[in-house]
From Swiss-Prot:
This is ATP-dependent RNA helicase eIF4A. The gene is TIF1. It is found in: Cytoplasm. It catalyses: ATP + H2O = ADP + phosphate + H(+). InterPro entries: DEAD/DEAH_box_helicase_dom (IPR011545), EIF4A_DEADc (IPR044728), Helicase_ATP-bd (IPR014001), Helicase_C-like (IPR001650), P-loop_NTPase (IPR027417), RNA_helicase_DEAD_Q_motif (IPR014014). ATP-dependent RNA helicase which is a subunit of the eIF4F complex involved in cap recognition and is required for mRNA binding to ribosome. In the current model of translation initiation, eIF4A unwinds RNA secondary structures in the 5'-UTR of mRNAs which is necessary to allow efficient binding of the small ribosomal subunit, and subsequent scanning for the initiator codon. Residues 69-239 form the Helicase ATP-binding domain. GO terms for biological process: cytoplasmic translational initiation. It comes from Mycosarcoma maydis. Residues 9-19 have a biased composition (Low complexity).
């Protein structure tokens, strides 16, 4: 972890390793790790973990996953800079699950997150990916019962994800024992510092074993984050995934003006013949909407399948398998799974609801034309959505035109 500032590059440094001198331009780190493994099968993951990865719906690693999973598994300290929504959570979750020993009932990995919601989200991802591994992941967050927290930690969770204040409290009370800890991961480090958790982060760090591996993920690299990396890490591997690795190139984007929300359903039904030419993914913003739309379409005798985070893992696995094999042609889902559905055949994406944040737009539709395939994206836009549509156009420097009548010819 910690090391003197002037240490030169490690002798066995990977390609392009440049020690600890972080060259920063515009708040970006400079990568010193070039290896890209763009297939989960080639990462030498445990069989049960690989099963969990595919069951979750991942097909191919995202840019950050293809670069960062392996160095973390190898035990390097790693700084990864990537925008939110690029698959960072699964990056460290997969690496952690590969490194821990499920037979040891003690905390082996600690993940700190800036908010309770993010901590709980990470917990869900770890549990889902580790579904076949018999591991326990506990969320150690404020606003919950301290006694219950202590009891849970006593039961021997191998992974703890939490907010800095509560984690520090638990370690201090000796409820969270760190003697078996080998990995410390800071997610959204920039956000953590901007929320004033710096002192608490350092306090937690001081209580960890000296040789703990440290992994830090951040969308931006302000000076404060770099100071953290200097204090916590030795010869870190640095990985930068620029925003433009996710591209809208080759994807034709259209909008359909829908006068009011209630009319979207009829619009979709009118498009259904077009939709089923190939496979399509339809995105809604809430799980409830997914269920509602599925019911409505089914009652009109359209064949669709649906998937969201409330479903059992086994159920999601079956749906994903059917969709991948092509036996189900239309999948309705939420953003939770937007990043996992890399299905090669998908050439049409419909945003029944525009995403509630613009970053998710590229995760939904970038999928349609991934890996050099062409794709079409159709956005349903009510008068309330016009501003968001313009915002998306500006953010991605792209143009979204009104859908032509011959859209079927373009798919």
């Amino acid at each position: 972890m910690s090391k003197p500032e002037d240490t030169s590059a490690a002798a066995a440094a990977p390609a392009g390793e440049a020690g600890n001198n972080l060259n920063i331009a515009d708040g970006e780190i400079e990568s010193n790790w070039e290896t890209v493994i763009d297939n989960f099968d080639n990462m030498e993951l445990k069989e049960e973990l690989l099963r969990g990865v595919y069951a979750y719906g991942f097909e191919r690693p995202s840019a950050i996953q293809a670069r960062a999973i392996v160095p973390v598994i190898k035990g390097h300290d790693v700084i990864a800079q990537a925008q939110s929504g690029t698959g960072k959570t699964a990056t460290f979750s997969i690496a952690i699950l590969q490194r821990i020993d499920p037979s040891i009932k003690a905390v082996q990995a600690l993940i700190l997150a800036p908010t309770r919601e993010l901590a709980q989200q990470i917990q869900k991802v770890v549990i889902a990916l580790g579904d076949y591994m018999k591991i326990d992941c506990h969320a150690c967050i404020g606003g919950t019962n301290v006694r219950e927290d202590m009891a849970k930690l006593n039961e021997g969770a191998q992974v703890v994800v939490g907010t800095p204040g509560r984690v520090y409290d638990m370690i201090n009370r000796r409820a969270f024992k760190t003697d078996q800890l080998k990995m410390f991961c800071l997610d959204e480090a920039d956000e953590m510092l901007s929320r004033g958790f710096k002192d608490q982060m350092y306090e937690v760090f001081q209580l960890l074993p000296q040789d703990t591996q440290c992994v830090l993920l951040s969308a931006t690299m302000p000076q404060e984050v770099l100071e953290v990396t200097k204090k916590f890490m030795r010869d870190p591997i640095r990985i930068l995934v620029k925003r433009d690795e996710l591209t809208l190139e080759g994807i034709k984007q259209f909008y359909v003006a829908v006068e009011k929300e209630d009319w979207k359903l009829d619009t979709l039904c009118d498009l259904y013949e077009t939709v089923t030419i190939t496979q399509a993914v339809i995105f809604c913003n809430t799980r409830r909407k997914v269920d509602w739309l599925t019911d409505k379409l089914t009652s009109r005798e359209f064949t669709v399948s649906a998937m969201h985070g409330d479903m059992e893992q086994a159920q999601r696995e079956v749906i994903m398998r059917e969709f991948r094999s092509g036996s189900s042609r239309v999948l309705i889902t939420t953003d939770l799974l937007a990043r996992g559905i890399d299905v090669q055949q998908v050439s049409l994406v419909i945003n029944y609801d525009l995403p509630s944040n613009r970053e998710n737009y590229i995760h939904r539709i970038g999928r349609g034309g991934r890996f050099g395939r062409k794709g079409v994206a159709i956005n349903f836009v009510t008068s309330d959505d016009v501003r968001m549509l313009r915002d998306i156009e500006q953010f991605y420097s792209t143009q979204i035109d009104e859908m032509p009548l011959n859209v079927a010819d373009l798919i």
